[in-house]
Amino acid sequence: GSTRIVGTLIESALKQDHEVTSCSVFDVDPTRFNDFDFIVLGSNSWFENKEEGQMNSGFHALKEKLKLDSFKGKKFAIYALGDSNLYHNTFCKAADHLEKLVREFGGDAVVPPLKVDRFYFDEEGNETKIIEWAQGLNQFLKQQQSR
């Protein structure tokens, strides 16, 4: 759905200057995180475990497979989708949960998260926002490589 569309837009922007591999959280092999220099995680904000604003259930399953240092030394960017009209108190809280997950397992979210509001209500405006964020991320990564 919309999370995949956003991921594809980010992937397209990053592919301009970087080798990119993408997969669903349901298909990820936790041992492969060491194969990558930088990782982007994304999720809609869901009603999970009787609470609004949670990350996708696939991340809860992934968390069970991770070791305490699974993300040690890894850098991350995070994006989340939500609806500020219907869920203003929990808008894009999935981003907060993903940042906590990254920190809990030794990683570092190095750029502010992208928060996409009501994706399908303004696809064109949101696509512009997503592409701009991804281009900024691309520039950040290029600067990191040149150091």
Give each language-model segment a name.
Residues S24-N34:
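Short acidic low-complexity segments
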Residues S2-I5, A13-D17, T21-S22, D35-R147:
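FMN-binding flavodoxin-like domain, especially the glycine-rich phosphate-binding loop
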